[in-house]
Amino acid sequence: MAGANTAGVDKEMVTQALNAELQDKGFLLTSAEDIINWARTGSLHWMTFGLACCAVEMMHTSMPRYDAERFGIAPRASPRQSDVMIVAGTLTNKMAPALRKVYDQMPEPRYVISMGSCANGGGYYHYSYSVVRGCDRIVPVDIYVPGCPPTAEALLYGLMQLQRKIRRTGTLVR
């Protein structure tokens, strides 16, 4: 690779060529952002915002049968210690300001998972005067988990999709 003319060559191709050459010698070429994203996916701390029946299924993910902590996903009680907020259940107009306040207390980068039909779009109570038709009207949502209520497996799948999304996208500047 030394002495080769790489003018106009895509950055990714150069990185792959250097990686191939250095891997034989026991080195790994990466960026600081990739290392930070890798570490962040292995230590996601989620906080519950359980509003209805979906919260029961959300609790199941921490129990021995599903054990979300084996994926590096652990619950936290404080929004200031959390990376992920899981909104589970029917969000009412009266509860919406509290949701936004808790979201604003979370440190950057922060992620939101909308769990269940009610959090995704109002669900069964969609046409009620007191229900917000989706928590994405109050906070930006990264992952939607469908179902009424979604199973613990569906939530685990959503959490793993969030880990993949974090690895795929840069999170230093959001």
Swiss-Prot record:
It is found in: Cell inner membrane. Binds 1 [4Fe-4S] cluster. Its main location: membrane. Its EC number is 7.1.1.-. The keyword Nucleotide-binding does not apply. It is a peripheral membrane protein. One of its GO terms (molecular function) is quinone binding. Disulfide bonds: none annotated. Its cofactor is [4Fe-4S] cluster. One of its GO terms (cellular component) is respiratory chain complex I. The keyword Metal-binding applies. It is an enzyme of class 7 (translocase). [4Fe-4S] cluster binds at C53, C54, C118, C148. InterPro entries: NADH_UbQ_OxRdtase-like_20kDa (IPR006137), NADH_UQ_OxRdtase_20Kd_su (IPR006138). One of its GO terms (biological process) is aerobic respiration. Keywords: 4Fe-4S, Cell inner membrane, Cell membrane, Iron, Iron-sulfur, Membrane, Metal-binding, NAD, Quinone, Translocase, Transport, Ubiquinone. It catalyses: a quinone + NADH + 5 H(+)(in) = a quinol + NAD(+) + 4 H(+)(out). Belongs to the complex I 20 kDa subunit family. NDH-1 is composed of 14 different subunits. Subunits NuoB, C, D, E, F, and G constitute the peripheral sector of the complex. NDH-1 shuttles electrons from NADH, via FMN and iron-sulfur (Fe-S) centers, to quinones in the respiratory chain. Couples the redox reaction to proton translocation (for every two electrons transferred, four hydrogen ions are translocated across the cytoplasmic membrane), and thus conserves the redox energy in a proton gradient. This is NADH-quinone oxidoreductase subunit B. It comes from Ruegeria sp. (strain TM1040). The lineage of its organism: Bacteria, Pseudomonadati, Pseudomonadota, Alphaproteobacteria, Rhodobacterales.
